[in-house]
Amino acid sequence: MAITPDKQKKEQQHQPQNGPLDYAHICKCIAMFFVVAGVVLMFFETGLDPEQKEQIKRLHQLDGIPHA
């Protein structure tokens, strides 16, 4: 019977720690997701050939022209 109160004490000690740890873990995951997304976007921006950039600029210019 002496083992169960010890287990309950240990569980009670661990429960408050799990909350903040899980919250911090979720925040880290979200932060990492945004960092990875930013790096991927930067890679695509810099990874394009100059010709592709020119084509994209032309497309944007065409979109900017009001259609008659």
UniProtKB/Swiss-Prot annotation:
**How does this protein sit in the membrane?**
Single-pass membrane protein
Identify this protein by name: Uncharacterized protein YBR126W-A
Pfam family name, one: YBR126W-A
Query: What's one GO-annotated cellular component?
Result: endoplasmic reticulum
Q: What residues form the membrane-spanning segments?
A: 24-44
> What is the first-listed, main subcellular location in coarse terms?
endoplasmic reticulum
User: Sorted alphabetically, which keywords does the UniProt record give?
Assistant: Endoplasmic reticulum, Membrane, Transmembrane, Transmembrane helix
Where does it localize?
Endoplasmic reticulum; Membrane
Disulfide-bond pairs as recorded: none
